C-alpha cells in the first residue's frame, strides 16, 4: 500500500513518533520506578514483602510531588509499592492501568509498615535512573532502568543475572529513528507532513482522542489545581472572553490538571512526558476545530506538532532544569501555524518567538503546578502564531534568538545541556531541603 511511497527518511520520522508518542498512565518518572518494581516482582514467586529503590536526582525531583493514579497519594514510595503489588510489567508506561483496589490498599499498607525505602543513587552519572529491589523471604529480584523511562538494562535475582542490555546499545542509537533527527531539519519535517500519505500517519489521531478525554475530565472534576475549570468559571463571570485564545488556555490546562491530579486516564505522551504530549496535542486540536479541519488535516497538524517537539527535545537531556512543556509548545505553535497558514516562514517565526519568550522557564519537579506551566506555554504558542501571521517575530538581533530557527533551537538546547546543569542541582537541593 502506502509503504512504496514513503522514502527512508519519512519512515524514520514515522518510527520516531511511534517510539516517542505513547499512552502513559500517571506521571512518567514515578511510573518508571513502578515499572522497575513490577518487572522485579515478576521475577519472584509469591507476593513482594519489602522494597528498596534507588533513583537519580532528576527522577527524585520529578517524583516527589506528583499524585500516583488511583491512590490519592504522592511520591515515589507509593509508585514502587503499587508497581510491585499490582503492576503489569508488560504494559510499559501503562504499568498501573490494571491495578486493583486491593493492590492499592496492600501498597498503602506496605508503606504504613515501613517496608518501602526510596533513596538517591549515589554516585549517579545517569539523568534518568531507577532501580527497584524487591524481597520475599530470602529471595530477591532487582531491575534497573537507565536513560529512558522504560529502558530496562539489567535484571538480576538471588540466583544470578537474568538479563543485561548489550554494550552496543548506544552505537545502535545513532542509526535509530531518533538518531536520524540529529541530521534533519524543520523544513524536511514540514515537507514530510505535507506529502506523506494520510494512512501512514492516521495513528496520531489517537493523541487527540486520549488527550481530549483528559481535557474533558479536567473540566468535569476538581483535579489538581483545577486551573481549567476555574478559568471556565471566570468566563461565565465575564472576566475572561469566550474566544479561541481562552479555549486553548482552558482546554490544555484542564488536561494537565487531570493528568497531574491523578486521574485514571492515560495521556498520549511525547518524549516520555504526558504533559509534553498534552501540550503538543490539545492546542492544535482546539485550532483544528475552529477552522473546521477534517481528520486528515488534523492528523497532519498533529504530526507536525509532535514531530517538531520530538526534534527539539532530542537535542536536550531526557530530564533537565528546562521545563519541556515549553519545547512541546513550540511543536504546538508549528501545528497551529500550519493549520492557518501552512508556510514554513510562519512556522519558523512562531518557534523563534517562543524561544524569545518562554525559554527561561525552569522545571522544579512534577506536580500539580505543571498545569500552570503547560497553560503558560500553550498561551505563548498561540501568541507567537498570531504574531507570525502578521509577519512579526523575535529577531536574530535579540537575546538567544538567531537569524535562523535551527540555530535558535540549538542555542536554547545548549543552555539546558550546559549552563542550566547548576540550576538543576540548585533546584534539587531546594526541594530536598523542603522534604526534611
Swiss-Prot record:
One of its GO terms (molecular function) is L-cysteine desulfhydrase activity. GO terms for biological process: L-cysteine catabolic process to pyruvate. InterPro entries: Ser_deHydtase-like_asu (IPR005130), UPF0597 (IPR021144). Belongs to the UPF0597 family. This is UPF0597 protein YhaM. It comes from Salmonella schwarzengrund (strain CVM19633). The gene is yhaM.
